[in-house]
From Swiss-Prot:
CDD domains: RfaE_like. Its EC number is 2.7.1.167, 2.7.7.70. In the N-terminal section; belongs to the carbohydrate kinase PfkB family. The keyword Zinc does not apply. The gene is hldE. One of its GO terms (cellular component) is cytosol. Pathway: Nucleotide-sugar biosynthesis; ADP-L-glycero-beta-D-manno-heptose biosynthesis; ADP-L-glycero-beta-D-manno-heptose from D-glycero-beta-D-manno-heptose 7-phosphate: step 1/4; Nucleotide-sugar biosynthesis; ADP-L-glycero-beta-D-manno-heptose biosynthesis; ADP-L-glycero-beta-D-manno-heptose from D-glycero-beta-D-manno-heptose 7-phosphate: step 3/4. ATP binds at residues 195-198. The active site is at residue 264. This is Bifunctional protein HldE. Homodimer. InterPro entries: Bifunc_HldE, Carboh/pur_kinase_PfkB_CS, Cyt_trans-like, PfkB_dom, RfaE_dom_I, RfaE_dom_II, Ribokinase-like, Rossmann-like_a/b/a_fold. Residues 1-318 are annotated as: Ribokinase. It comes from Serratia proteamaculans (strain 568).
Length: 476
């Protein structure tokens, strides 16, 4: 399936559900408490992250879509922290404050990458009047292209049937990430997105794919669903619709570090794509690609449009790797049209080592795209002597282009890349070492164009010269 990423900026999505704040306390532990046989943790770092339905809303906003979040909170520090975090990532919060209840908060204490304890602060909102939530949905429906109901069984969706009916009456697709085995309450939804465990809790264990499809199609009919998307971890996803052949999407994950929040990413990307005008099949394809990205990250995370584009089309198809100057100018112009920040650096990069990789990764973090300009073989000889380079230009560029941090690699013949930098005019020019910014080739041109120049440190003790010397001395 060939899918083009939509303009997510024209998509409006409302997320309604159980919002919560995830708190993390990190610190070392080296002794046992004299008060009880428990470890003492010296808390050094505190992190706060939006969780539950709030994480779905963040995934939608990370794509550049208009993301609005409705949920129930208390009137407390947790609610204020949640709102502040979400505002930072352009999620519009429209919470219903309940003074008699605390904001749902999960506090985790960790030491040496091990979770020691989790403390939950919650009472549930099942007895809270749902009318304010229904009113907010009704008000938002004319401005949105999709409604997401994120159910964590904490009470925000106690009147889920009323919410479904409001959306269907307005002809707005309603997508639900279900909880529990009572799927009757989701009757009439446009799409349910259970994982395999949640699906089999309702229909029973499926011995093979054929049985999964058969039972899934029966579930679609029984609950009058328009579609069912079963997420199946390493087996990808299966989309089932009445009267249409099943669509099986194999996983695109290269590595799996953490599946936390992957379901939030799936439904968030799916809803944003639908709201932006993609078909359901195309939206599922994009959601599957996004899931492959997010499980390769540690902790609850989101996916950017750039990461999604790379996952869908591949680095070669999206104009990555080694380029001529003319090709680079075109790629940079397209990046700027997308609002991306272009970073540029340069060097010989003769024998690539850990210091280079770390430096390039840090440079890439400063923007959306990274250009690496590489000295030609002749230029390297003039600067380093007749014995250099060890590796020919073509090989150096191939290795650099294979790095995840590097988007574009371009050669230059001169001793410095000043002419090339003046042609490209990156938003940020980066150089490693102990340079003064004003001494960096191209800095004057970049500043004159309104850009910036930054110096990054190299890791001590790592250099191509030292590696070559070690090899000559027989220490390689």
């Amino acid at each position: 399936m060939k899918v083009t990423l939509p303009d997510f900026r024209r998509a409006g999505v409302l997320v309604v559900g159980d919002v919560m704040l995830d708190r993390y306390w990190y610190g070392p532990t080296s002794r046992i408490s004299p008060e009880a046989p428990v470890p003492v943790v010296k808390v050094e770092t505190i992190e706060e992250r939006p969780g539950g339905a709030a994480n779905v809303a963040m995934n939608i906003a990370s794509l550049g879509a208009n993301s609005r979040l409705v949920g129930l909170t208390g009137i407390d520090d947790a609610a204020r922290a949640l709102s502040a975090k979400l505002n930072e990532v352009n999620v519009r919060c429209d919470f219903v404050s309940v003074p008699t209840h605390p904001t749902i908060t999960k506090l985790r204490v960790l030491s040496r990458n091990q979770q020691l304890i989790r403390l939950d602060f919650e009472e549930g909102f099942s007895n809270v009047d749902p009318q304010p939530l229904l009113e907010r949905i009704q008000q938002a429906l004319p401005q949105i292209g999709a409604l997401v109901l994120s159910d964590y069984a904490k009470g925000a969706l106690s009147q889920v049937q009323s919410m479904i009916q409001l959306a269907r009456a307005a002809k707005v697709p309603v997508l639900i990430d279900p909880k529990g085995s009572d799927f009757e309450r989701y009757r009439g939804a446009t799409l349910l997105t259970p994982n395999l465990s949640e699906f089999e809790a309702v229909v029973g264990h499926c011995k093979d794919e054929a049985e999964l499809v058969e039972r899934g199609m029966k579930l679609v009919a029984d609950f009058e669903l328009s579609a069912l998307l079963v997420t199946r971890s390493e087996h990808g996803m299966t989309l089932l619709q009445p009267g249409i052949a099943p669509l099986h999407l194999p996983t695109l994950a290269q590595e799996v570090f953490d599946v936390t929040g992957a379901g939030d990413t799936v439904i968030g990307v799916l809803a944003a794509a639908l709201a932006a005008g993609n078909t359901l099949e195309e939206s599922c394809f994009l959601a599957n690609a996004a899931a492959g990205v997010v499980v390769g990250k540690l902790g609850t995370s989101t996916v950017s449009p750039i990461e999604l584009e790379n996952a869908v089309r591949g680095r070669a198809e999206t104009g990555f790797g080694v380029m001529t100057e003319a090709q680079l100018k075109t790629a940079v112009a397209q990046a700027r049209q997308r609002g991306e920040k272009v970073v540029m650096t340069n060097g010989i990069f003769d024998i690539l080592h850990a210091g280079h990789v770390s430096y390039l990764a840090n440079a890439r973090k400063l923007g959306d795209r990274l250009i690496v300009a590489v000295n030609s073989d002749a230029s390297t000889k003039r600067l380093k002597g007749e014995t250099r380079p060890v590796n020919a230009l073509e090989n150096r560029m191939i290795v650099l282009g294979a790095l995840e941090a590097v988007d574009w690699v371009v050669p230059f013949e001169e001793d410095t890349p000043q002419r090339l930098i003046a042609d490209i005019l990156p938003d940020l020019l980066v150089k490693g070492g102990d340079y003064k910014p004003e001494d960096i080739a191209g800095s004057t041109e970049v500043w004159a164009n309104g850009g910036d120049v930054k110096v990054l440190n190299f890791e001590d003790g790592l250099s191509t010269t030292n590696i070559i010397k070690a090899i000559k001395d027989g220490r390689g």
